[in-house]
Amino acid sequence: MDTEAHSLQPVSIVIVNHNAGALLTRCVHAALEQAQEIIVVDNASEDLSIAQLTHSFPGQNRLNIIATGRNSGFAAGCNTGLSAATQPYILFLNPDCLLQENSLQRMVRVLESDAATGMVGGYLVNPDGTEQGGGRRAIPTPWRAFVRAFGLYRLEKYWPRLFFDFHMNKQPLPQAPIEVEAISGALMLVRRQAIDDAGPWDEHYFLHCEDLDWCMRFQQKNWKIVFVPDAPVVHFQGTCSRSRPFFVAWHKHKGMLRFYRKFFRQEYPSVLMGLITLSVWLRFSVTVLIHAVRNCYRMFKFRHE
């Protein structure tokens, strides 16, 4: 028998859904086994995800489904769920994530072990068991993002301080919880007191970089952010955004610029910030071009089969 006794954690799990399909039901099923309260905020989904969810859990009093009626973005959805949460800890969880057995309990244990810890993340893995890049990372400063975007992190072994890769999944997995600069918004366990101190999610971000913004603000208020290596969560990354690559790319790059201007404008010369802005939009243009070429190739291949 597992030495970790099964119990529901004093956690409200907030899941922001937009067309997550059958994965939403799987996500909620795993969440109900570990947390006191599940809040699903539906941002105007057009698929059957909510219908499947209500059919699977009729009369479940620990499940609260909130239909916003519009898609106001991930951060706004998180704040809607936060307003409805009743537990002392809140886990923001993507609908394409599956909590593994005892993962939430281990994250809560770390959060409760130090009153200075405001945010905890788990071990985000792909379906094949490999670690994803965003679960533990350094803050992507404009320079670090430039290094990452243009592949200069390959020079890290020669000049580690200059060409540092902010994704830490290439480093050995730690044997114990460690403090990090940032974790992924797909899996964030947060102390309510820390939220009251740092403030809610910034709703000016529609999609992407709002998690980094929150990590920065938590650190500015001296709250620790901790990565828990023995709390695995499977993340089917991109499930909700795969069908809208241009839309997602636009908001991702727009979010990057807001993040840089908000936190680094005073630290970098205006000329360098201008170059960073140019490089971000150049990267966006290349991303759009790649997607367009792929779509044209698929259409051409389909017509000739």
Question: Which residue ranges define each predicted feature?
Answer:
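Short, flexible, basic/aromatic active-site loop/helix in glycosyltransferases
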Residues: 139-180
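Short, well-formed alpha-helical segments that are part of the catalytic scaffolds
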Residues: 15, 19-34
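Conserved donor NDP-sugar-binding/catalytic core segment of glycosyltransferases
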Residues: 98-134
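Short aromatic/hydrophobic "clamp" motif used to bind/position activated sugar donors
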Residues: 90
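Glycine-rich, basic loop-to-helix element that forms the pyrophosphate-binding segment
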Residues: 67-85, 106
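Active-site-adjacent helix/loop segment of glycosyltransferases
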Residues: 216-294
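A short, conserved alpha-helix in the catalytic core of glycosyltransferases
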Residues: 172-232
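A conserved acidic beta->alpha catalytic loop
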Residues: 30, 42-52, 70
